[in-house]
Regions:
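Long, low-complexity intrinsically disordered regions
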Residues: 1-211, 216-217, 223-296
Length: 296
């Protein structure tokens, strides 16, 4: 949701404002696995057309829905439930299939229905968009496997394997504690360089790319098996507390109260850094100061 996107930006970009996610350089869409993404406008095709089904049936469904939606809207914007009714859909969420054409944008603020509208088709082929999506995934999540890419993107294992095969000459095989995987050859130098300085504390929102991992990859980020279910819960995930670049706990917010659950005893300096991060979160509509409550 946009608030999570805003906090992800805040964790990485200085002077993030409550309205930063609404910048004209950004767009909202139903992206990989039909989840809501906020991405750079120039990357719209990558995160939409890159997930277009390879099979004829899936492709027809996406393209037919997109064409019908474009016709119904006629250049206007509409709540997605109303658009679903206008198309005779028994479930308006089926509109998400149309997003894989790269012609559907949305505005969703979390509490209300999403507003949908259509835009011209991207000037890029589905294949090129898919391969760039795989490159982006490898750059952020690598070392990675075709299987993990297929899970994350929702395109399935066969299509993911095909994408990695197409990129084979630009990939480098690596061995990790959880198995063999791949990185971009262009990232090999970065992977071998010792990490630079990191922020003392960061609060990452639910679903942040830093810990949006599946399967055994989670073991690399949180080695303690007893702690992993606390971060990757069966329902809505909490946020992750980063201290000196390592996940050291979880956090949730209710109104103006941020509750931090630390996994280990932390220093007073680290505690102060976490509290400073929490009180500086650029939360839209929050008028009172943030209060931090600790659970240890």
């Amino acid at each position: 949701m946009p608030r999570a996107a805003l906090l992800s930006i805040n964790a990485r970009v200085a002077e993030t404002k409550p309205a930063s996610w609404e910048d004209q350089s950004l767009v909202q869409l139903w992206g990989p696995r039909f989840n809501v993404y906020v991405v750079a406008r120039r990357d719209l095709a990558i995160f939409s057309l890159g997930t277009l089904p390879d099979d004829a049936k899936g492709m027809r469904r996406a393209e037919d829905l997109a064409a019908r939606l474009h016709s119904v809207l006629g250049g206007t914007r509409m709540r997605h439930e109303e658009a679903g009714d206008a198309l005779g859909l028994h479930n308006a969420n089926l509109l998400r299939y149309a997003a894989a054409t790269g012609t559907v944008l949305i505005r969703w603020e979390g509490a209300k229905q999403a507003t949908v509208w259509t835009v011209p088709p991207p000037a890029v082929s589905p294949r090129d968009a898919r391969l760039e999506l795989a490159r982006r995934y490898l750059h952020v999540y690598g070392p990675a496997t075709p299987e993990s890419f297929g899970q994350w993107s929702g395109i399935g294992p066969r299509s993911a394997v095909a994408a990695f095969e197409a990129l084979r000459e630009s990939l480098t095989p690596v061995r990790t504690p959880v198995g063999d995987a791949w990185i971009l050859a262009s990232d090999e130098t970065i992977a071998l360089v010792a990490p630079g300085p990191v922020a003392r504390a960061r609060l990452l929102p639910s679903g942040d790319a830093f810990f949006l991992l599946q399967g055994t990859d989670r073991e690399l980020l949180v080695p303690d098996a007893a702690r992993r279910p606390e971060l990757w819960t069966p329902r809505v995930w909490p946020g992750a507390v980063l201290i000196d670049g390592e996940i050291s706990g979880t956090w949730r917010r209710a109104g103006t109260t941020v509750t931090v659950q630390s996994w280990d005893r932390i220093s007073s300096a680290a505690r102060e850094a976490v509290e400073a991060e929490a009180t500086a979160l650029p939360l839209p509509g929050v008028r009172r100061p943030i209060v931090v409550r600790w659970e240890e």
